[in-house]
Curated annotation (Swiss-Prot):
Signal peptide: none annotated. PANTHER family: METHYLTRANSFERASE, UBIQUINONE BIOSYNTHESIS O-METHYLTRANSFERASE, MITOCHONDRIAL. One of its GO terms (molecular function) is polyprenyldihydroxybenzoate methyltransferase activity. Pathway: Cofactor biosynthesis; ubiquinone biosynthesis. This is Ubiquinone biosynthesis O-methyltransferase. It comes from Pseudomonas aeruginosa (strain UCBPP-PA14).
Amino acid sequence: MSNVDHAEIAKFEALAHRWWDRESEFKPLHDINPLRVNWIDERAGLAGKKVLDIGCGGGILSEAMAQRGANVTGIDMGEAPLAVARLHQLESGVAVDYRQITAEQMAEEMPGQFDVVTCLEMLEHVPDPASVIRACHRLVKPGGQVFLSTINRNPKAYLFAVIGAEYILQLLPRGTHDFRKFIRPSELGAWSREAGLEVKDIIGLTYNPLTKHYKLANDVDVNYMVQTQREA
């Protein structure tokens, strides 16, 4: 059975043409991207590395990592976002290899081929996130690093990520997130360890609605990122 939620894919298909509009529904992704790329680059040293970006969408993270000198492959199951990614690539001149394939299928094709694997803001949109994490472990080289991000599951996360972001501040379209699919750090850590990935670091991402700025912080109550590593 394919680990794909077609309703989730359809949400992003409908919005794909606005992916690179920095004032669109994707503004939060553009705003947090420099923070995420810096955090990953500081830990993995992207220059010269072979990187796989799972759930790449329209290519915001993929292009940014390629600009740091990485050899990036971006995969997604959304046809429209990938078309937008390829089109933007022609405009930007940034080289990324985009493919429409699942993480699990990619792991069958190219096990142990990547120095770094990223899977950001994607796990909460698939039926079986643990399956994706197992695929990440298979895809990364021994000693390589896997970076994951998602949203915590607690009342504060519901208030901020759903009610606040989708209804009050309208940073995201209503229905973008399903609170039931949010993932606690303890769950993400357990799935990572079960897959053979050691958790090395965790950092939160917070938003100030007054200044409209994001920053990295030790607060992992809502958005957070995790650095894991496969044994050498």
